[in-house]
């Protein structure tokens, strides 16, 4: 490795956008999440719905990747993926999952812990056919996480399938689906001055939510 040109140990900034107090919290974590997501969208953060999805393989090796949140309500958070993907294989073995939303500009982050469950075909089909047509075709192209010789393989396959599906609706691939993450815990983090950040953890307890303030 060449000599490090950037002193990353010295890179830091103060967090000054405000704190998070217990009086700001909602009884349901999804209500606070909705407020924060709306503010992230209003601030025109790029990919405000992007979340890091953490899964674990059968050897205990954790993996992360960015995926877009496509729906949320009090039943959980929903995302879609190729069912032949690495993440799908992990979830088949171990449904425990983490989601992380990094909203750097707002000096906020949200951590979600829960369990993933496959969506019904009806739910998946409804969303699939709401996507742009080229995105529907793109879902057919990729056998996610498989090895390919070049990008040209994907581009050629896309053109082939675009011609094949030129007439009528693009069918739902059998290897494409979605997951709903039922939430067991959710942490809200707001940056604070002098590294005294505000953290609140919601945990399911006795049919409701128990809230703890955590030290930064």
Curated annotation (Swiss-Prot):
InterPro entries, per this entry?
A: Pyridox_Oxase (IPR000659), Pyridox_Oxase_CS (IPR019740), Pyridox_Oxase_N (IPR011576), Pyridoxamine_oxidase_dimer_C (IPR019576), Split_barrel_FMN-bd (IPR012349)
Catalytic reaction annotation = pyridoxamine 5'-phosphate + O2 + H2O = pyridoxal 5'-phosphate + H2O2 + NH4(+); pyridoxine 5'-phosphate + O2 = pyridoxal 5'-phosphate + H2O2
UniProtKB keywords: Flavoprotein, FMN, Oxidoreductase, Pyridoxine biosynthesis
Which positions bind substrate?
Answer: 12-15, 70, 127, 131, 135, 195-197
Please cite one Gene Ontology biological process associated with this protein: pyridoxine biosynthetic process
| UniProt keyword annotation of Membrane present | no
Reported EC number(s) for this entry are 1.4.3.5
Q: Does the keyword Amino-acid biosynthesis apply?
A: no
Q: How does it assemble?
A: Homodimer.
Q: What is this protein called?
A: Pyridoxine/pyridoxamine 5'-phosphate oxidase
Which gene name does the record give?
A: pdxH
């Amino acid at each position: 490795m060449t000599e490090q040109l950037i002193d990353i140990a010295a890179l830091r900034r103060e967090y000054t956008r405000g704190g998070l107090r217990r009086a700001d919290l909602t009884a349901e974590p999804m209500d606070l999440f909705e407020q924060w997501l709306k503010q992230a969208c209003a601030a025109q953060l790029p990919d405000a719905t992007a979340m890091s999805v953490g899964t674990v393989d059968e050897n205990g090796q954790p993996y992360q990747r960015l995926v877009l949140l496509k729906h949320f309500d009090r039943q959980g958070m929903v995302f879609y993926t190729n069912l032949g993907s690495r993440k799908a294989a992990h979830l088949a073995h171990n449904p425990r999952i983490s989601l992380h939303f990094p909203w750097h500009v707002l000096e906020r982050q949200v951590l979600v812990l829960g369990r993933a469950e496959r969506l019904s075909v009806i739910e998946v089909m409804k969303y699939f056919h709401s996507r742009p047509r080229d995105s529907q075709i793109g879902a057919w192209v990729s056998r996610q996480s498989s090895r390919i010789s070049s990008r040209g393989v994907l581009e050629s396959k896309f053109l082939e399938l675009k011609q094949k599906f030129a007439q009528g609706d693009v069918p739902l691939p059998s290897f494409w689906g979605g997951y709903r993450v039922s939430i067991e815990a959710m942490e809200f983090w707001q940056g604070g001055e002098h590294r005294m950040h505000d953290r609140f953890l919601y945990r399911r307890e006795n049919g409701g939510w128990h809230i703890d303030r955590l030290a930064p």
